[in-house]
From Swiss-Prot:
The keyword Disulfide bond applies. Keywords: Chaperone, Disulfide bond, Membrane, Metal-binding, Mitochondrion, Mitochondrion inner membrane, Phosphoprotein, Protein transport, Translocation, Transport, Zinc. GO terms for molecular function: identical protein binding; zinc ion binding. This is Mitochondrial import inner membrane translocase subunit Tim8 A. Mitochondrial intermembrane chaperone that participates in the import and insertion of some multi-pass transmembrane proteins into the mitochondrial inner membrane. Also required for the transfer of beta-barrel precursors from the TOM complex to the sorting and assembly machinery (SAM complex) of the outer membrane. Acts as a chaperone-like protein that protects the hydrophobic precursors from aggregation and guide them through the mitochondrial intermembrane space. The twin CX3C motif contains 4 conserved Cys residues that form 2 disulfide bonds in the mitochondrial intermembrane space. However, during the transit of TIMM8A from cytoplasm into mitochondrion, the Cys residues probably coordinate zinc, thereby preventing folding and allowing its transfer across mitochondrial outer membrane. A motif (Twin CX3C motif) lies at residues 43-66. Belongs to the small Tim family. It is found in: Mitochondrion inner membrane. The keyword Membrane applies.
Length: 97
């Protein structure tokens, strides 16, 4: 039994590059869908007083502004995380100090 678990571990290490790419793409899609869901929920709660047969101009402007601010904020956070990640020393380098 131990040999099968070690062989499955080595099989995971040698995953087909196409499969890895597929998994990465699907993970990105899932993250995007989660982001859209969060944005929709947040903006709906903020902008929609009472659902009606037609979206009034105030609600439409609120939705547009909400979505733009959500995207701006998300982009700002991603950029800040990227800067922070680049400025941190590599873990192995910090151990050698």
């Amino acid at each position: 039994m131990e040999s099968s678990s070690s062989s499955s571990g080595s099989a995971l290490a040698a995953v087909d590059p196409q499969l890895q790419h597929f998994i990465e793409v699907e993970t990105q899609k899932q993250r995007f869908q989660q982001l859209v869901h969060q944005m929709t929920e947040l903006c709906w709660e903020k902008c929609m007083d009472k659902p009606g047969p037609k979206l009034d101009s105030r609600a439409e402007a609120c939705f547009v502004n909400c979505v733009e601010r959500f995207i701006d904020t998300s982009q700002f956070i991603l950029n800040r995380l990227e800067q922070t990640q680049k400025s941190k020393p590599v873990f192995s380098e910090s151990l050698s100090d």
